[in-house]
């Protein structure tokens, strides 16, 4: 059996690695580099260039040079993130017949997996050149927050490249594997902060040592599949374009050739500013007008770059907070922070991470190579060459089906360790129902319509029976690649239907985050509504009690007192109709203050032991409250 190679298929760069004689080795490509740019170019003569050679000719062939294609993999053309990308890249992103986002090169439409396959072929060839034998099997990494369709599309890319993809694993998990192989003994919890070229991921991973075996369990994962180094480059490009426009009045955005040169220069400047305080972007003959050629020369300081991208760095912190919360772990319990991805070399990123986690991140893991190394280790585990590592990954979102009343019934909760299988028995909603539709959903909301539809299928020929009698067993099975298989079986007849959730369309990161945020916001809204309702009820009670007191007081209340109380009652009645809890409480306090002099006067004139006006009212109200609570307790029993 040949080697199972490990491939990090990155947005900006890719890397291939193998495990040899117990050691992980990152392989150099034909150009002698350990990483290969994930860039593919289609030359006019039909030649396909991959990697450094494609990058070198990008300036002269911008429309047919494809980069950051991973950002399109498994996505619909209409998604906001794709529409945003169309504005940023010089090549053409088009709508496929199935509504997916594809690219067009020399008049030919191509799917993102086809293009990514060219990079995988180069990785495969690099490994074959080193090993001197054919390579047919691989472990490929994906961002932890990639959804079902994005994972499927990555597997398809492997198949197109002639590789049997034995396992798709999450990039942060792979990085932790690379880091954990030579770790000291004992248990520890690590954070993997992975800010790559196009995606951001954070994972909380527990590495336990059980009888000499390293067990890697992902406790929680979070991220943003549309935030990475490319976005940092774009900020710098926009700044350079603006500076040039201020100086010359010319806008470079309409010139693909100039923009391609700017992209290269911005990336180079960004890298330089990680080690130096200032750099020059000098691009002679960037464009020309009637007066002659124009040159771009802009000085950029590190602090200027940091001010341009500060909000992007801050955007990575919220997913870190969510991942810790989902894992149920306090930040103080984290033993190590591992940085992965070239963008983590930026001093501002390192400083922000250190401040949030309260400890310096580790620098001994190469951020560009760790993921591929981990993939090679997992490949060796699958091949049986490594026996003391067990990897337990998680599903990033809740999965379930639509049930009666448009409710989503969850079968597999988010952050469940995979592979996993879960079955539940459902029944029919109507008498003599002969078929049921199984509607598979992904998301965190209770209402089915507010979650993402992954697919539907029908289970037909159910024998006639009263509603609630047939037993339909629905099984959800997530394999080790995070890909979902759903089946439904009529227990009476044994008839079965199933579906593999294919790469028809995926959830965008925005949609995922929106679902979680919506669910949290709804819980908060419900709490606020309850508090508002309570305040309104208290306000109404106070108005009623005060009016009763005024009636009982009769002539004892002076005209001024009556006027002040009536005014306060009117203001409270207006507030109770509104939605501002604080305003209701303020007007209640104002009414209480307005009634205090009259209440004191009436209290002083009462015979000893007599009840205060309004007290009976309060007592009745209090009795009601106790009754209600008591009844509720009985119901719960």
UniProtKB/Swiss-Prot annotation:
Function summary: Acts as a chaperone.
Family listed: Belongs to the heat shock protein 70 family.
Protein name (record): Chaperone protein DnaK
Keyword terms: ATP-binding, Chaperone, Nucleotide-binding, Phosphoprotein, Stress response
Keyword Chaperone included in the entry's annotation: yes
Region named Disordered: 605-624
Organism annotation: Ectopseudomonas mendocina (strain ymp)
Residue positions, PTM Phosphothreonine: 199
InterPro entries: ATPase_NBD, Chaperone_DnaK, Heat_shock_70_CS, HSP70_C_sf, HSP70_peptide-bd_sf, Hsp_70_fam
Lineage: Bacteria, Pseudomonadati, Pseudomonadota, Gammaproteobacteria, Pseudomonadales
HAMAP family according to UniProt: DnaK
Molecular function via GO: ATP binding; ATP-dependent protein folding chaperone; unfolded protein binding
Induction: By stress conditions e.g. heat shock.
Low complexity bias locations: 605-615
